[in-house]
UniProtKB/Swiss-Prot annotation:
It comes from Alternaria alternata (Alternaria rot fungus). InterPro entries: 6-PGluconate_DH-like_C_sf, 6PGD_dom2, Mannitol_1_phos_5_DH, Mannitol_DH, Mannitol_DH_C, Mannitol_DH_N, NAD(P)-bd_dom_sf. One of its GO terms (cellular component) is cytosol. This is Mannitol-1-phosphate 5-dehydrogenase. It holds the Pfam family Mannitol_dh_C. NAD(+) binds at A7, V8, H9, F10, G11, G12, G13, N14, I15, G16, R17, G18.
């Protein structure tokens, strides 16, 4: 395979190496990894190949990833800008909170770009409209002239990604173990009228991304996190063990029954189709082969409890429609109890916020719900319960 196309990817972590780079590599792209972690960049620079192992019920398959380079943006920002300026695609998998920190090099590269077609900019994050968010940070650093002609320089497309990367084996190095199932949906409208749609095997281009994003976030992420937080409270180690407990299994299913009702009524998805999707997701996260650690899945509770995320996002919309949200709020309570977990800074910060603020302040600060909104009083009651230790 010839590797004449080039993609720059921010984030040398497991999703970057094991999902995004795998797809790009298998579609003939040379991948340039960008990260600030010395250890990851040094490993990528010293190692010419790494292996992605896809696991599933029917066994495993392995891919060798090569034709990549790596740059440390902490030390060689000018080089990063040059690479992006001459790339076909720039992607990221850094976490939604880091998008603002990877905006400046993209902005500088867009200013410097001389190719006669626009670069494709695609954020691969577990967040709604992450590329739009990234674009806002990028455009804040562009000249007015470039902003006026942005379509000739860059096209920004939101995406929805779905693939579970479980806890990795110790001493695995750069190799990544990942589930076989994958979904990467990208909106295609931004590439109309002169854009260059990335030719990546496995990307599903769609006209309207919102149903795909919400279906994924409010089913996969909601069920996964619900299992994690209930599992943590019940001192269960792995997600599949949570799902093999009938009571906990039913609790997780109840949460995604509520979100399924939203997906069906809001987006016009057939009930049978959404039910089948829910079944597929429950089956996936119940897979013992993944050995998915409860604390890994539960980490970053502040983000997961925020306004547009997997619990409050669907619960707020359902509450505004006068629909049932009991199971989702049960999961919210368990998420609030995910405090002071070793290795997770947000769980420590959550404990601090709960200690230093009133319940009303916590709900506004953490959940983004204001007094007078349908969920407010019920969330306040949950926080008071957690603060009271009951």
């Amino acid at each position: 395979m010839s590797y004449e196309k080039k993609a720059v990817h921010f984030g040398g972590g497991n999703i970057g190496r094991g999902f995004v780079a795998e797809f790009l590599h298998n579609s003939g792209y040379e991948v340039v990894f960008v990260d600030v972690m010395d250890s990851i960049i040094e490993s990528l620079q010293k190692t010419k190949t790494y292996t992605v192992t896809e696991i599933g019920d029917d066994g495993e398959r392995k891919f060798t990833i090569d034709h990549y380079r790596a740059i440390n943006s902490k030390h060689e920002m000018d080089k990063v800008v040059q690479e992006i300026a001459s790339a076909d695609v720039v992607t990221c998998a850094v976490g939604p909170n880091i998008l603002k920190f990877v905006a400046e090099p993209v902005a500088k590269a867009i200013e410097a770009r001389t190719l006669d077609y626009p670069i494709a900019v695609i954020a691969c994050e577990n967040a709604i409209n992450a590329t739009t968010t990234w674009r806002g940070f990028i455009e804040s650093k562009l000249s007015e002239e470039t902003k006026k002609n942005i379509d000739s320089k860059a096209r920004f497309a939101n995406s929805a990604i779905d693939r579970i990367v479980p806890q990795q084996p110790p001493n695995g190095g750069l190799d990544v173990v990942i589930e076989k199932f994958h979904e990467w949906c990208v909106e295609q409208k931004p590439f109309e009228n002169g854009g260059k749609k990335p030719d990546v095997k496995g990307i599903h281009y769609v006209d309207d991304l919102e149903p795909y994003i919400e279906r994924k976030l409010f089913t996969v992420n909601t069920s996964h996190a619900t299992a994690a937080y209930y599992g943590h409270q019940n001192k269960v180690q792995y997600i599949h063990e949570v799902l093999h407990d009938k009571k906990l299994h039913d609790t997780v299913r109840d949460a995604v029954k509520e979100t399924a009702h939203l997906i069906v009524t809001k987006h016009g998805v057939e009930t049978a189709e959404q039910d089948a999707y829910v079944e597929e997701i429950i089956k996936r996260i119940s897979n013992p082969v993944l050995k998915d650690n409860v604390e890994r899945v539960g980490r970053a509770p502040l983000r997961k409890l925020s306004r547009k995320e997997r619990f409050i996002g669907p619960a707020a919309q359902l509450a505004e429609r006068g629909e049932k949200v009991d199971a989702l709020l049960g999961a919210v309570e368990q998420a609030y109890r995910f405090q002071n977990v070793e290795g997770d800074e947000e769980s420590v910060e959550l404990a601090k916020i709960l200690k230093e603020n009133s319940a009303e302040e916590v709900v506004t600060k953490v959940n983004g719900i204001e007094k007078g909104q349908p969920l407010f009083d019920r969330l306040v009651a949950i926080v008071k319960k957690v603060q009271g230790g009951s």
